[in-house]
Amino acid sequence: MLRAQDIDASRPLTTEEKSFDVRTRKQLFDLIVAAQKSAFGADYELADPERELEPNAAIIFELEKAPYCLNYGLQFTLKPGTARYNKVQGELATFMQKAATLKSPEEAAAMNETMNPIDYLNLGINIYVNDDAHIEFISFRRNPQKITKPGARYVVRGEGVTATALYFGHFGPLREEDDTTPGSKAFAATPKFNPKTSRLAVQSILLVITAPHDIVDALYSKMNLAALQSMIAP
């Protein structure tokens, strides 16, 4: 299968393609920011508000009726001066003091498998639109949730940080891929494109949220899943 990374995207985008990019970006940006504010109030802020979901890659498949693929990244940081920020800083100071007393690599490894307060300082979201997305879930050592079928929320819980994948649209079976990181796994989700649908249409969305368990759960609880699903073409 031809993948986004195999394509030469050097040619300029057409007006229609730019319009699709802008429209899709705004819809996703508004939905995610609304969920973040509803879950955390003013505790988190955009790390780079000028970018507002600027695409990392805008790839045009050169195959007839194939879709326009977009990859976006959105990063929030914990706002200094908030109660949540001060709490994390206090916990981080305690964590670092404890780390300084460790006497062996084994002790350090065991401590690294606990919650590190520094994980709360950032909330990262990767967004894949119409993309043959290859997602590596590292820290997949304990209690991995079995991934069965696309179309729902899948949670991969490591020690401390959760990678949560939200799939919307038309996907084929998830497949496990080789991963060189000891104790970890990698999965990929391949969209199933409908040739009867307009090339410039959202046929699949995959969100990958990386943050501590409780942060991911709070954000997910406020996500307008119906609005995300409504972006998908029939």
Residue ranges and their predicted role:
Residues A4-Q5:
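Boundary of Sec targeting at the N-terminus
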Residues I205-P234:
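Surface-exposed amphipathic alpha-helical segments
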Residues P12-F193:
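Short, solvent-exposed recognition patches
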